[in-house]
Design a protein with these regions (language model features):
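Catalytic alpha/beta core domains of metabolic enzymes, predominantly
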Residues: 1-70
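C-terminal extensions of enzymes
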Residues: 69-122
């Protein structure tokens, strides 16, 4: 306190709890998958705590996709949502994103959209 220093959490599963304890926001890789959900949480968790917890339940479970073949899976996801890019990465061999892992990302994309519609009422 008393400085301009702000702490941002990069762990999606602990985000809500850390913001309740004073963290300034989120700066994690899962924002590559659904940034709008993190924006909503950071802006609204104080005024709508029950809804924030509902969202956090989804985000915490969704964060497990990070353990798959990140960042290749994120690049694949970006292609699915209309942002074209190669799957090549310095960190992971894109060949590790097998057909079944691609299917998991496709299903993850679909369930995220289902959650988004339910959560925002669209």
């Amino acid at each position: 306190e008393g400085t301009g220093l702000k702490i941002f959490n990069a762990n999606a599963a602990t985000l809500l709890r850390s913001m309740e304890m004073g963290c300034a926001g989120y700066s994690g890789v899962m924002a590559n998958f659904h940034p709008d959900l993190y924006v909503w949480l950071c802006k609204n968790y104080k005024e709508q705590p029950e809804k924030a917890q509902e969202l956090m339940n989804f985000l915490g479970a969704a964060s497990m996709v990070e353990c798959q073949v990140y960042p290749v899976n994120s690049k694949y996801h970006m292609n699915l949502v209309g942002v074209p890019m190669t799957l090549q990465s310095r960190r992971q061999d894109y060949k590790l994103l097998t057909g079944s892992k691609k299917l998991e990302i496709e299903e993850f994309c679909a369930i995220t959209e289902t959650f988004r519609k339910s959560f925002f009422g669209k």
